UniProtKB/Swiss-Prot annotation:
SMART domains: DEXDc, HELICc. It is found in: Cytoplasm, Nucleoid. Belongs to the helicase family. RecQ subfamily. This is Probable ATP-dependent DNA helicase RecS. InterPro entries: DEAD/DEAH_box_helicase_dom, DNA/RNA_helicase_DEAH_CS, DNA_helicase_ATP-dep_RecQ, Helicase_ATP-bd, Helicase_C-like, P-loop_NTPase, RecQ_Zn-bd. GO terms for molecular function: 3'-5' DNA helicase activity; ATP binding; ATP hydrolysis activity; DNA binding; four-way junction helicase activity. Residues 25-192 form the Helicase ATP-binding domain. Disruption phenotype: Cells lacking this gene have an increased sensitivity to DNA damaging agents, 100-fold decreased plasmid transformation and 4-fold reduced chromosomal DNA transformation. Sensitivity increases in the presence of mutated AddAB nuclease. PROSITE patterns: DEAH_ATP_HELICASE (PS00690), HELICASE_ATP_BIND_1 (PS51192), HELICASE_CTER (PS51194). Its EC number is 5.6.2.4.
Amino acid sequence: MTKLQQTLYQFFGFTSFKKGQQDIIESILSGKDTIAMLPTGGGKSLCYQLPGYMLDGMVLIVSPLLSLMEDQVQQLKARGEKRAAALNSMLNRQERQFVLEHIHRYKFLYLSPEALQSPYVLEKLKSVPISLFVIDEAHCISEWGHDFRPDYSKLGQLRKKLGHPPVLALTATATKETLQDVMNLLELQHAVRHLNSVNRPNIALRVENAADTAEKIDRVIQLVENLQGPGIVYCPTRKWAKELAGEIKSKTSSRADFYHGGLESGDRILIQQQFIHNQLDVICCTNAFGMGVDKPDIRYVIHFHLPQTAEAFMQEIGRAGRDGKPSVSILLRAPGDFELQEQIIQMESVTAEEIADVIRVLEKTEERDERRLRDVLLQYGVGETQARMMIHLFMQGKTSVELMKKEISYRMELKLEKMHRVSFLLQRDGCLRQALLTYFDESYEPDDGNLPCCSHCGFDLSLYEQKGERSKMAPLDSWSSELHRIFSLQTVGELN
């Protein structure tokens, strides 16, 4: 048994790696900058956690996902690793200060890109050796990526300030142009690239047409009642997530709830935990749900709407079947779906007058901390996405109405272009899997016939239906107390 295999078994209890993991880890251990693409459920976290036990110094993980940070830290602690912490907005001032004052004691530190931009945090990080700088969801760096986050664009410069540690840039879905953008912005021209297929052959792909929205609702009810769960229903808006969850609860025997970014942090975590621990059968949600939720046995994902990008679609269906067992993705399509998504994107549009007002507000704000600026804009009534983009442009010195309007219009055009492309992919004749893989510049060789492919190639949906009674669930109040326990954990106690 090699040292790598010994470490894998000692700290994670596995006797073998998932496809692609070992090559990525060996690249990291050789000290090379690495760009890695693994499909959702491919085991990305192990690719940096295992090297952490074989390298001196801290592993610093930048992630935009609060739920992912908390989940990963709890998993590490459950395995007996006390040297893990997350530095984000969920910590109160005292907890945050404790982590920073004891920063030399941590092996794994998760933090948001916003936290990393704090001069105080940066100075503390400079005092410890960093063996690996991990950028999770690396596609957020690129304007071509489906989830561009302006805060990510500064990570290349921040890496230099931290002493230029080796980088691992991770993503589950990215096109060639997005990956090239990531390489350029992080200055990773000589990085080793390990790009695994986005294909998930254990997930059958199905597109169904409905006459109207009412028919789609009826079909969701039917699918949730009949399919083997648990499952996720992705919805276009917060309102739809809440309404569909209500319909499912009133018309089926399934335990359902809704989830979106507008819920209080405690409510979001409670719903996640109830779902993970089988106290809910189905979650109706916006795209705020799923990333960082580690549940391997999700059996189906339903899209009640047209996704905005092919990348988002692949990530969202990838929540299913992470245990490798047969699962199904179903997209429900009806007239007007495209126009609805177009309206949602165009809601991000702002007039020249609104931009001028925002610039005046930003210029009057004495504190130029990005978090403070964002809070000001949110109080002013600017949307989260708009606020992120406007502050990014403002901090770059693009403070004229014309420049800001031009950049925002460009972003909207990119989003509309991507939506047109995914709409075309999902409506064209031919194998759906092949069309999606072609979008990601992958060739596709059909399976030998053992695994169902897509609705064009044909498969029997009854294969994914329940075979017996729904399993009974634990009382919900057990997780209310567990949530209280999680929030009551003292950072001091965890390290001592």
